[in-house]
UniProtKB/Swiss-Prot annotation:
SUPFAM superfamilies: Nucleic acid-binding proteins (SSF50249). This is Translation initiation factor IF-1, chloroplastic. It is found in: Plastid, Chloroplast. Belongs to the IF-1 family. One of its GO terms (cellular component) is chloroplast.
Length: 77
């Protein structure tokens, strides 16, 4: 049976250390998150201010895993 996950969108507020990030969700919660292995292998750079998708376990909702970095839609270059 596959584990159940919640997927949320949020904004990276800071990156304190060791690949951990603090993500502010749309409902104003602040969750520490780490980068998934596929993003790490693809060398995708995540910086404060980026919008990301994270998945949170239903069993431990105190931390999440960043699974996707959303593109900036406001840049018209």
């Amino acid at each position: 049976m596959k584990r159940q996950k919640w997927i949320h969108e949020g904004l990276i507020t800071e990156s304190p250390s060791n690949g951990m990030f603090r993500v502010r969700l749309d409902n104003x919660d602040l969750i520490p998150s780490y980068v998934s292995g596929k993003i790490r292998r693809s060398l995708i750079r995540i910086l404060p201010g980026d919008k990301v998708k994270i998945e949170v376990s239903r069993y431990d909702s105190t931390r999440g895993r960043i699974i996707y970095r959303l593109r900036n839609k406001d840049s018209k270059d």
